[in-house]
């Protein structure tokens, strides 16, 4: 889903924005009770605090994919996340289940950095350079079309929770991997597995060319030149400031951060790992967290016995995740209550066929 194509697609009536918080909470609570098991609301960790209390499940991308695959009861799945997550939920659920996204503008800039036409142009060039020695691996933060291509070519999806296991498996299948769309997760994972940086190349989808100065025979990992616009804003300078001003503070970051940041942090991991590690830490411990602002704020609220700050004090929330708010959730639920279909996410059968192969490989390995 291209964000530029959907920037003016918000058709929610204005009266929802004029309701009080209390009115909206009461209505959402009422509709949830009426729909019962026919409604399921999965919610990503990066969602707004006003939405999270209504979630039936909260988690990272892997957890939500697993939950979607297991849920067979709910007719309506209202996904509080972004577009690629709702696509994944649609593909993993039955044809009778309906997946909706409260605001169609909730996309992902990283996912949009890997266009299927760019990938189909890249693949034959890479085959010419390396022959049949490459396994494609896509971060779950990608479009259904990208997942489908990867699945059709024997590859798999991956999340930040299972990246080490999945990439290790992938490198056992072929001599090298093509990791997309997030170069940083790919680089950090491969480095953790012992692959030196000089054996990693960059694929530039704009120029449609490989960026690599070494011997091609040494290249083990090809990284698509994409990134997370949120995690790019955590810098080495942020870490230096914490070390200087708060030397006791433990720094934990998401692996979508740059390699330089991850290398200097005390630890890195998925949103699930970050939440679990801080929740289980001893009272009085101090933390600087390098991930999305909504989640950091929630961790602070849930751990009043610890000192927790954002690694970057000027960090903003993920703006597309932030599209999902209480008015849009209520608007969506009222449509379901009235028998109307709105903002359904539906992936076509051909795309689903091969994307499921990539997703199922990941879930089996996880």
From Swiss-Prot:
Chain residues that bind [4Fe-4S] cluster: 108, 228, 318
InterPro entries, per database record: NadA (IPR003473), NadA_sf (IPR036094), Quinolinate_synth_A_type3 (IPR023515)
Highest taxon listed in the record's lineage: Bacteria
GO molecular function: 4 iron, 4 sulfur cluster binding; metal ion binding; quinolinate synthetase A activity
Subcellular localization(s) per the UniProt record: Cytoplasm
Entry binding sites for iminosuccinate: 44, 61, 139-141, 160, 254-256, 271
Disulfide bonds: none
Reactions catalysed, as given in the entry: iminosuccinate + dihydroxyacetone phosphate = quinolinate + phosphate + 2 H2O + H(+)
SUPFAM superfamilies, alphabetized: NadA-like
UniProt-listed GO biological process terms: 'de novo' NAD biosynthetic process from L-aspartate
Cofactor: how and how many bound: Binds 1 [4Fe-4S] cluster per subunit.
Root EC class: transferase
Functional description taken from the UniProt entry: Catalyzes the condensation of iminoaspartate with dihydroxyacetone phosphate to form quinolinate.
Alphabetical list of HAMAP family matching this protein: NadA_type3
UniProt similarity note: Belongs to the quinolinate synthase family. Type 3 subfamily.
Protein name as it appears in the record: Quinolinate synthase
Species annotation: Listeria monocytogenes serotype 4b (strain CLIP80459)
């Amino acid at each position: 889903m291209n964000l530029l194509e959907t920037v003016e697609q918000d058709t929610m009536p204005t009266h929802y924005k004029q309701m009080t918080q209390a009115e909206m909470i009461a209505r959402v609570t009422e509709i949830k009770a009426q729909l019962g098991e026919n409604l399921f609301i999965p919610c990503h960790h990066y969602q707004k605090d006003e939405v999270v209390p209504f979630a039936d499940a909260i988690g990272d991308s892997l957890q939500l994919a697993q939950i979607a695959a297991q849920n067979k009861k709910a007719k309506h799945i209202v996904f509080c996340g972004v577009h690629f997550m709702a696509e994944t939920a649609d593909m993993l659920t039955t044809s009778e289940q309906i997946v909706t996204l409260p605001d169609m503008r909730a996309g992902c800039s990283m996912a949009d950095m890997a266009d299927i036409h760019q990938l189909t142009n890249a693949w034959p060039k890479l085959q010419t350079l390396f022959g049949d020695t490459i396994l494609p691996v896509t971060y779950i933060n990608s479009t259904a079309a990208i997942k489908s291509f990867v699945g059709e070519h024997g590859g798999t999806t991956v999340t930040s929770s299972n990246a080490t296991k999945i990439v290790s498996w992938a490198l056992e299948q072929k001599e090298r991997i093509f990791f997309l769309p997030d170069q940083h997760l790919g680089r950090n994972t491969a480095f953790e597995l012992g692959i030196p940086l000089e054996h990693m190349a960059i694929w530039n989808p704009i120029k449609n060319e490989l960026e690599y100065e070494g011997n091609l025979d040494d290249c083990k990992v090809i990284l698509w030149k994409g990134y997370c616009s949120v995690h790019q804003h955590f810098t080495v300078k942020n870490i230096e400031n914490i070390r200087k001003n708060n030397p006791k503070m433990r720094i934990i970051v998401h692996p979508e951060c740059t390699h330089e940041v991850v290398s200097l942090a005390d630890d890195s991991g998925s949103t699930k790992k970050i939440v679990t590690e801080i929740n289980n830490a001893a009272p009085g411990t101090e933390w600087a967290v390098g991930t999305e602002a909504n989640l950091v704020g929630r961790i602070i609220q849930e751990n009043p016995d610890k000192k927790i700050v954002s690694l970057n004090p000027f960090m903003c929330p993920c703006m597309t995740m932030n599209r999902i708010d209480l008015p849009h959730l209520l608007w969506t639920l009222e449509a379901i209550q009235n028998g109307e279909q709105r903002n359904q996410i539906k992936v076509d059968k051909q795309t689903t066929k091969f994307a499921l192969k990539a997703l199922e490989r990941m879930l089996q390995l996880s």
